[in-house]
């Protein structure tokens, strides 16, 4: 059956705040920085990477160029 081990990750308020703060300063992380954050927040590098990918997608949607909307 489907692998139940990995459900949707929920982040604590603290983790989210820290990730948002980091994103505010740079939308792309260096590997070194990702490792530091992973250690600081007790998350895996993979989780950090995915969070940033998702956050960038969200950011792009929010900052769409005003123009003809090609849906």
Curated annotation (Swiss-Prot):
One of its GO terms (cellular component) is nucleus. It holds the Pfam family Homeodomain. The keyword DNA-binding applies. CDD domains: homeodomain. Residues 4-63 bind DNA. Gene3D superfamilies: Homeodomain-like. Keywords: Developmental protein, DNA-binding, Homeobox, Nucleus, Transcription, Transcription regulation. It comes from the Eukaryota. InterPro entries: Antp_homeobox, HD, HD_metazoa, Homeobox_CS, Homeodomain-like_sf. It is found in: Nucleus. One of its GO terms (biological process) is anterior/posterior pattern specification. GO terms for molecular function: DNA-binding transcription factor activity, RNA polymerase II-specific; RNA polymerase II cis-regulatory region sequence-specific DNA binding. SMART domains: HOX. The keyword NAD does not apply. Sequence-specific transcription factor which is part of a developmental regulatory system that provides cells with specific positional identities on the anterior-posterior axis. Belongs to the Antp homeobox family. This is Homeobox protein Hox-A7. It comes from Ovis aries (Sheep). The gene is HOXA7.
């Amino acid at each position: 059956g489907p692998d139940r081990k990995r459900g949707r990750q929920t982040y604590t308020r603290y983790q989210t705040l820290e990730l948002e703060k980091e994103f505010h300063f740079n939308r792309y992380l260096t590997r070194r920085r990702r490792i530091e954050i992973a250690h600081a927040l007790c998350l895996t590098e993979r989780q950090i990477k995915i969070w940033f990918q998702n956050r960038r997608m969200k950011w792009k949607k929010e900052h769409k160029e005003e123009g003809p909307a090609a849906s």
